[in-house]
Amino acid sequence: MINIIIKANMKKIILQGYDVGDFSNQQSIVPIYKGNNIEAYLAQKAPEAREIFIYAHGSQYFSHEHSLPQLSLTLQSSNNELVPSILSKITENTEENKPNIVHILSCHASTAHYNMQNINGNIVLCTYAPANYVSNGYVAELLFNTKNNFDNLNDFIVKKLPLLTAISFGISYKLDENVYPLIFDNSSIKGMDINSFSEFLQKQYIKVQKFYTNLQEKYVDKYPELFPEYNFPEKISYSTEELKQAFNVLLNLDSEKLSIEEIQHLLAIDNSHVGNILADAIKCNRTDAIEVVINTMKEATTVDLHSAVKFNNLAVLNRLLDKTEKVENCILQEAIQEHKIEIAEMLINSNKIKSFTNDYLLVAINANNLPILKILLNKEENIVGYLLYRAAELENINTAETVELLFDKTKETDYFINTRVLLRAVKENCLSLINKVIGRMNEFDDIPDVIFDSVIERGNTQIIKILLEKIASFDFLIKAINSNNLPAVEDILKTIKVENKDIAAIIMSGNTDMFKILANKIGDDKILDIAIKLGDSSVVNNILDEKEKQGILDSNKLDEIFETAVKNSNGNVIEDIMNRMPEVTGKHLTIAMQYYAPERAFIFDKVYNSIKQIEYNLILTAIDSGIPDVIQKLVSKLGDEKKASILYDILRSSDIVKNMVVSNILLNNIAKIPDNYKYALLDLTSKGNSYGIKNFFIFNRLLEKSGPIDEEHLNTYLGLLDPSDMFSIMCMGSLYNMKHLASNHNNITTVEDTIVDNLTVTGEINITPSDVNLL
């Protein structure tokens, strides 16, 4: 009995290089390290030995067999590391020099066995490809999954010896600076049959026994965890299926090195998986090998069809289509994406595609494959809107042609799809598609700004005319104006009915060329009116200069223009117009009063300051307007005599509000009431006018501006005061505190007491001497 076993239940991990596919069950078996994580893992300390799978692209540094191999573990191939340096990092970071088990699943992996002396530390290395072989994903995954069914390495080697022999499995132990390799050679089994291969395996089995026996005897004491007891059967046997699998793996491992006779021989033993050999044969254009493989297979798989599509081999694809009942979606999609038109057409016409879905169209659209799209559209009756939207989004050359094909096949399109398609059509000046989209749009649909921008940018007048029949002309005109596109502006103005907002937009652009185009269309009177409203002095003056040259600018026209300017509060324009007038008169000030508002006060001031003489009727007009600021300005130029006369007329009116407001303004501007108006005004306010209106507030203000009052009038006015009226009380204070009364009464307290007594007797109001002083 020989005892050889590798420690079971070691922690398994995988270092996965870039650009290699995942194994189907790797996530559930091992932690995975990729990219920068690999570098971090190789740098960290490990307390226990591990079982490590390195799955990466491998290459030999030199061409000869024993050269140093490389592994591509990172994204950049220039960062490839030599296998010995990677393995040394693993061993050096394992505590107590415990031996790790490392499996290299890559091309040329066996080369590593010839460089074991370059590795620092103890290690068990397993490889699964000869030094001169290129491995493949099928074989790598098969071996990975097979090994993971065994925790015991010896079990794996013994029970899977046919498979390992076929792939030239190699194992090396590096212990205490000594290297012990065992490497199988598959070259002799290519011509064997099942029986001879079975006999050959018995000899290989004896080599395995001897190899481990020697190691166990030498190292069992020092490394007992590597060499516990293991029971080797006296004789080993394998099932026919296991033996066939080995031949099939050999067939797929590197078929380029097999002769046609060897291929035929191996296929005769097992043809269950021929995907790799067929792919290699198509790639190398080995027609004899292709013929042999296809004749042998019962049914073509998706992998086989993929190989024919990948290498664009119509003849092989045609043969394979005869060997399958159904073509999977991915095959046709691949042909479309790769722009393999003949391949795609053959697949479409093969009747092996069960249903044509919009998925194929999407692939053709994304690939901008117009020929294939045309073929596919013949198979589809109705296209979903998303495909049309997607096509319109692409920025490829001649996308509009693709979009138009889809648009014709899409029965229903919404606003968003229509606008996106319209933008694409505009960008490529596709008039036919523009007409189709416009015809399908709702009359109330808005056109996004991006379409306006695109139309104006290209300046295609035909497109402009088409769109003007559908869309709001003003928005379109604004875009043309803002981009200074004269041809577009001219075309739009020819088509639309020009409105004030259009004129305003052109005026505000400041573009004189556009201005001339507009003037030719509507005449300058309309432009002048809008320019005045906008306050554009430059345009106004240009038009007025032209009218002066033509002799058609008279005073009536200027008055009309002046009133328009006043209405629109354009001070600069008003000033320019007044400068053209022979004289600014009351008529112009009346207009300014007519449209007066606090925010327009500056306009009134401009006109007011330009008038040389204020006529009396203007003042009356101002008073009638009831505008305090206007009245204030006009009466300020009058003398006190004239102001008193107007005040008398105002106080005689029946308008209480005007009576109060205008009287106050006048009194604010009168320094002293003329004597000839003093008693007339005081009588009018205290006794009442013909309408019975008294105004003790104004009466009190008149007292302030009237000077001394004789005793007769004083007594009369005191008798007229109403103690219940607040303003009457104010008047009492004014009367009793006038200077001329102080000189006629030696004891003012007696006078105050008299007032208080009189007021108290009335029973209507009580007032104290201190109240009188306060008043």
Swiss-Prot record:
Keyword Repeat among UniProt keywords: yes
Key words, A-Z: ANK repeat, Repeat
Organism: Rickettsia bellii (strain RML369-C)
ANK repeat placement: 66-95, 300-329, 331-356, 357-385, 447-476, 523-552
The UniProt record lists the keyword Repeat: yes
UniProt name for this protein: Putative ankyrin repeat protein RBE_0801
InterPro entries the record matches: Ankyrin_rpt-contain_sf (IPR036770)
Signal peptide boundaries: none
